[in-house]
């Protein structure tokens, strides 16, 4: 994670290393187009808190301004000429403006980070033709759309919000449910709650029906929690929580 580049190791079925390819910082997921060319890599480039004194205790600093944050990226490894001759193209988000993304409800929020640094590719899927890739940007509550033919990131699209006040939805926001023999009991359930939640997907897959590409996402929800930065809090820790 501390290196400027991550590595993808290409091996044959017997485990022999054919080539090692440098990709973006902190690779998280490796995927394939339908024809296996190119190989796709999502690299998060997550923030790294500074060390107070790495020669002694190696305790991380709690000062977020001292953290380093590498660019998130998507790497395209071309193996059409064989694994031993593989080449790589690394795409990042340098062309995307932070202010414009914020206006479109894309979360860009780590202190001092640009959009290119803050967006963290998590997981990748492609369409059936292998011409488009869809990349989850979990912490940003968004997905990136990649043109695999022209090797460019076309868009970063916010996934919006789930309205928990809608009729028929039941909301359980408590992590203090009682259990009996490991089974949840007496869940705290509310309806009509005036809250909106973010989807923040992790894994993504795709399928085609009636000529249309559909994306299926596992909406895990996530928070950033480091020694130098933590965004999570409970209602009890916020002002005005009693009135809610």
Give the ranges of each region predicted by the language model.
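Beta-sheet-rich non-transmembrane sensory/scaffold domains
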Residues: 1-244
């Amino acid at each position: 994670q501390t290196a400027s580049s991550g590595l993808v190791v290409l091996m044959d079925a017997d485990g022999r290393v054919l080539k090692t390819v440098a990709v973006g910082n902190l690779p998280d997921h490796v995927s394939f187009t339908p024809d296996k060319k190119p190989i796709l890599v999502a690299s998060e480039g997550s923030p790294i808190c500074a060390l107070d004194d790495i020669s002694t205790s190696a305790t991380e600093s709690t000062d977020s301004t001292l953290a380093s944050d590498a660019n998130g990226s998507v790497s395209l490894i071309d193996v059409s000429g064989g694994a031993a001759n593989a080449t790589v193209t690394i795409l990042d988000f340098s062309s995307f403006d932070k202010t414009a993304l914020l206006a479109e409800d894309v979360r860009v929020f780590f202190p001092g980070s640009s959009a290119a640094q803050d967006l963290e590719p998590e997981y990748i899927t492609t369409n059936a033709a292998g011409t488009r890739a869809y990349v989850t940007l979990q912490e940003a509550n968004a997905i990136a759309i990649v043109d695999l033919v022209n090797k460019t990131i076309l868009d970063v699209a916010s996934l919006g919000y789930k309205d928990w006040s809608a009729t028929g939805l039941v909301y359980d926001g408590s992590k203090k449910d009682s259990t009996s023999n490991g089974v949840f009991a007496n869940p705290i359930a509310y309806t009509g709650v005036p809250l909106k939640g973010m989807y923040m997907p992790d894994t993504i897959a795709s399928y085609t029906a009636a000529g249309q590409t559909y994306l299926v996402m596992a909406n895990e929800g996530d928070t950033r929690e480091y020694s130098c930065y933590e965004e999570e809090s409970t209602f009890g820790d916020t002002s005005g929580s009693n009135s809610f």
